[in-house]
Amino acid sequence: MIISSVGATYAQKAEFRAAWIATVENIDWPSKRGLSTEEQKREFIALLDMHRKNGMNAVVMQIRPAADAFYPSELEPWSEYLTGKQGQAPSPYYDPLQFMIEETHKRGMEFHAWLNPYRAVFNTARSSVAPNHPSRLYPEWFVDYGDASKTTRYFNPGVPEAQDFVTRVIRDIVKRYDVDGIHFDDYFYPYPVAGKDFPDAKAYQRYGNGMAKDQWRRSNVDSIIAKLGRTIKQEKPWVKFGISPFGVWRNKTEDPEGSDTKALTNYDHLYADILLWLRKGWIDYVVPQLYWEIGHERADYLTLINWWSEHSYGRHCYIGLAPYRANSNAAWKDKTQLPRQIQLTRTTPNIQGQVYFSSKSFLNNPNGWNDSLQNNYYRQQVPTPAMPWLAKKPGSQ
């Protein structure tokens, strides 16, 4: 157990404290496909109770990992990660999303619905794909991209109809469910595969409008983020919109505004201009994934937390932390690695919380980190920080 005065002095402050609960490939929940409704519910409640006991006040729950649904939808089929077969409803029937929101709220925690905007088929060789899956109904919206080990099918971000469809999916969720937030992770255009360009030449030819291809790709992502920001607020102006990007926007060598890092970047490789979205106020919070250790040679945690602190433009910035890396190398065998990273989120200006990848990392209390949270850092429960620019939820204090 690591004790620090920062834990104690921070006790009374509002802070966002959350875990990502991943459903893709059954990473966190359900533990395997085809569990009974009762087993699924029991597992989810056990996860929630663990996170609550650790002091979390929110969960970021993946409800649409691959153009599929953990809720009844007229737009996309039931997820294979629930039942083992895409399109098959849970039996006995229940609405997992409704159940999860209710259980989360019962414990005084926020529920952020996490979606992958563009991933449609996780693995084209072995994923279950239902007849009513969008990739079967509208094949012209999709492209395949990957390497010898795995090919994934994606919505083509350059096709306007694909953007509109994803917007309809989000609108439907916000309209029908009492979510506190809508959350995207780092997958916009996919991470580049060596020697292979993303196959969007036809869409570029049709919709490129004379822009350079990189610029056009960025404009496609900008356009959907702006559209979603508006759509969410039209439906429920109190619902938060957050994005958890890869931890580096740009390197200093490419842009004087960039960080002193030597890494892949959001802007140049994933075509995601996070800073623009923050500056424009299209999103309410950002969770940069700072999954490197303090002192990392190419992407130092300290360098990056300071950089993001200076580039949040008045929106909330929570730091994505990596308990899954426990014991993966010498730095992550150090029991103080995660506690020191938490301390830095509290001593660095403009940082309002932490989000942990992922839920299952806490099951075995790696390096005693659960104890550190319960007995020190999160000893006192606190509310999530207020966003004064948002409308108040009807009936809230």
Where are these regions (language model features)?
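Aromatic-lined carbohydrate-recognition surfaces of secreted/lumenal glycan-active proteins
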Residues: 105, 110-123, 183-187, 215-266, ...
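Extracellular glycoside hydrolase catalytic/binding regions
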Residues: 211-212, 217-224, 237-306, 328-343
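Active-site-adjacent "subsite" loops/lids of carbohydrate-active enzymes
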Residues: 14, 22-42, 113, 118-176, ...
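Aromatic-lined carbohydrate-binding/catalytic grooves of carbohydrate-active enzymes
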Residues: 54-91
